[in-house]
């Protein structure tokens, strides 16, 4: 493993921030599956061949599954807390045989990229901009997300440290 992989393994808090962002704003807001046989789901009869839609948007904000579900709290995904999350309560990359094969890679890549950005810049949402999520193929902010980037003075800060996201270890 090279330096990038070693840093990625230590970016626990950065990954927690990304995962919490994906909980509130899942890349794909819903997924569908076809029932391979008859079943009962929450007291409703599902016939073979029926299309069942699971909304990650609703699932990730469900009050029975998440404490303060509308609050951004990356601590949910830190070691010690993450293990308490029901395995079917958090599905940003889907689940089962059709789970996104790039899930692990994309999370690692996002953590490395975010750490490098935060090491060099501070980011601020443009004043008075309200981010409105819209579903296309993926969930995204309508009209983009206009940000103000400011170069940080100390270019040698540890990845993520200036943003309050510190590598563990």
What are these regions, as identified by a protein language model?
Residues 103-139:
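Cytochrome P450 heme-binding "Cys pocket" and the immediately downstream C-terminal segment
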Residues 54-82, 158, 164:
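Conserved cytochrome P450 K-helix/beta-meander segment immediately N-terminal to the heme-binding cysteine loop
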Residues 14, 20-23, 30, 143-169:
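C-terminal domain-closing interface element
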Residues 81-90:
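Active-site-adjacent bridging/hinge elements
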Residues 2-42:
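Conserved cytochrome P450 K-helix E-x-x-R motif and the immediately C-terminal K′/meander segment
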């Amino acid at each position: 493993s090279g330096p990038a992989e070693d840093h990625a393994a230590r970016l626990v808090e950065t990954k927690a921030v990304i995962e919490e962002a994906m909980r509130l704003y899942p890349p794909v807001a819903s997924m569908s599956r076809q029932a391979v046989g008859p079943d009962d789901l929450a007291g409703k009869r599902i016939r073979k061949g029926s299309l069942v839609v699971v909304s990650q948007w609703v699932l990730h904000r469900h009050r029975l599954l998440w404490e303060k579900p509308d609050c951004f709290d990356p601590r949910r995904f830190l070691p010690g807390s993450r293990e308490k999350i029901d395995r079917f309560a958090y599905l940003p990359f889907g689940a089962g045989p059709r789970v996104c094969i790039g899930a692990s890679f994309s999370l690692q890549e996002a953590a490395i990229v975010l750490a490098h950005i935060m090491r060099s810049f501070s980011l601020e949402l443009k004043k008075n901009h309200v981010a409105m999520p819209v579903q296309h193929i993926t969930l995204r902010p309508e009209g983009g997300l206009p940000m103000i980037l400011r170069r940080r003075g100390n270019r040698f800060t540890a990845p993520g440290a200036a943003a309050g996201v510190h590598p563990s270890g």
